[in-house]
């Protein structure tokens, strides 16, 4: 099992790269919205308005991403020996004989770390909600597309 400190560092790097990319795209959209060519040619021309909507949406996503980075950076990597699953836990699940490893983090949900061997889940996600408070040996159930999935918590690190 990879170390949680290494996974945290990898997640922070991944989120940082994503933030830089989004900030570059946001700057380009803002420049496009205020560029001379974006001025409406008639009352039906909405290029500048569309660019401003896109810029506003990107700005909101940038704020969310910065909050995720701050949450992950502040994540305490405490011991989970004989403790229930909480933020910062590295969890190994078994579902029908197939093992999966998850990192419960405050941001970066869906990211794959350690060459794809570890998936990041967040507390608001269905799986994150189902995992919170569980102990090793307990079963986790969640409904996906009308079908119940049952997993067993093998280890918490």
Where are the language model's segments positioned?
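Helix-adjacent hinge/juxtasegments
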Residues: 66-67, 71-85
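Non-DNA-binding regulatory cores of transcription-related proteins
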Residues: 79-147, 151
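Short hydrophobic/aromatic patches at helix-to-coil boundaries
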Residues: 153-157
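Helix-rich terminal scaffold detector
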Residues: 1-68
